[in-house]
Amino acid sequence: AARRIVRAAATVFACLLLFAGCSRPSWTEAERASLRGLSLSSLPPLPPDPSNAVADRRDAAELGQRLFFDPRLSANGKVSCAHCHQPALRFTDGLPLGQGLGPLERHTPSLVGAAYSPWQFWDGRADSQWAQAIGPMEHPREMGLARTEIVRRVGEFYGDAMRAIFGSFPILEDRARFPADAAPREDDPRAREAWEAMAPEDRVTVDRALARTGKVIAAYERQLLPGPAPFDR
C-alpha cells in the first residue's frame, strides 16, 4: 500500500511539472510588436485612387450600392454584382466556383479590403476597382450585357443620379447609333462589328459612361473594409 501511495505521489508530481512546463508563454516585446504588425488594426488609411475622382464621395458610394444590388443590369434580369458577392458571406458566394449566367472557372474572391490592392481579379488584369467593377457586366457568363446596353440601362434607371454626380450621362435612345449588342469584344465578332460600325465619338461617349458606372460602384466597394478578427483580440 505504501508503494502505491509513493507511486501515486510521484505521478502527481510529474503531472505538476508537465503542466508547469505548459504554462502561458512569456512574449518578448519584439515578439509582441511582430504580432501587433499582423493585426488588421495596423492597416494604414486607404490609399487614394487618382483615377477615380468620386472614390470617396458619399453620394457616389450610395448610388454605387444601388447599382451593385440591381439585377436589371444583367442579360436575364436576375444577376447583380451581389449575386456573387453576398454580404452575408463576406462578399463571396460560398461556392467552389463562381456562378453567374453560367458556370465560371474560378472561385469568387471577397471584396472586403480589396481597395488596398493595386491589382484586381485573380490574375491582376485590372489596375483599379472601377475597371474590375465593369468587367463582370460585360462577361458573357457573368452578367452578359453588351457595353452599349449597360450604358443604356444605367441611363434609363439612374440617369438623373449619375448626372448629379458627374454633370452629364447619356441617354442612348437612338438604337441605330447605339446598337444594343455593340461591344469591343474579341470573342464575339458580331458585337465587335456593331461596335466598330459606330462613330468614333459615339464609342467615346459609351466608354466614358461605362467608366463612370464602374467608378460609382467602386466608391461603394471602397467602403467594404475588414473588421477585427479573433486574432486581433
Model-derived features with residue positions:
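Bacterial N-terminal signal peptides
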Residues: A8-A20
